[in-house]
């Protein structure tokens, strides 16, 4: 137990000195050094999103592969990444046109 406690104290002391050394050499960022936040408003005052971001978002939302077309009675669950059964499929198994009635 004594060796483990000493080892823990030495590790804590090393970590604290490392943090102090990093803190001494730090300086404040200027506006040029600050990272550009993705999706932030334009800096030129016109508002809206940059053209590249709009183009990227349109590509994502219009691509059929991103929507993952599933067979009738199933819907794509983006969290699971698979097609999952819908409630209407459970209520009306084997008849996905139940709303139209029998024709």
Curated annotation (Swiss-Prot):
The segment annotated Disordered runs over: 25-50
Please report any disulfide bonds recorded for this protein chain, giving both cysteine positions. Answer: 70-83
Give the UniProt keywords, A-Z.
Answer: Cleavage on pair of basic residues, Disulfide bond, Pyrrolidone carboxylic acid, Secreted, Signal
Residues annotated as carrying Pyrrolidone carboxylic acid in the record are: 68
Predominant cellular place of this UniProt entry's protein: secreted
The signal sequence is 1-23
Its tissue distribution reads: Expressed by the venom gland.
How is it modified post-translationally?
A: Pyrrolidone carboxylic acid at position 1 has no significant effect on the structure of contryphan-Vc1.
Q: What is known of its domains?
A: Adopts the 'single disulfide-directed beta hairpin' (SDH) fold. The secondary structural features of this peptide are highly resistant to thermal denaturation. In addition, this peptide can be truncated (90-103 DEL) without loss of ordered structure.
Q: Which residues form the propeptide?
A: 24-67, 99-103
Q: What is this protein called?
A: O2 contryphan Vc1
Q: Which domain of life is it from?
A: Eukaryota
Query: Where does the protein end up?
Result: Secreted
Question: What cellular-component terms does GO give this entry?
Answer: extracellular region
Described purpose of this protein according to its UniProt entry: Unknown. Intracranial injection of the peptide into mice does not produce toxic effects. In addition, the peptide does not produce any observable changes to normal or depolarization-induced intracellular calcium levels in mouse dorsal root ganglion cells.
Could you say which protein family the record assigns here?
Belongs to the O2 superfamily.
Compositional bias annotation for Basic and acidic residues: 25-44
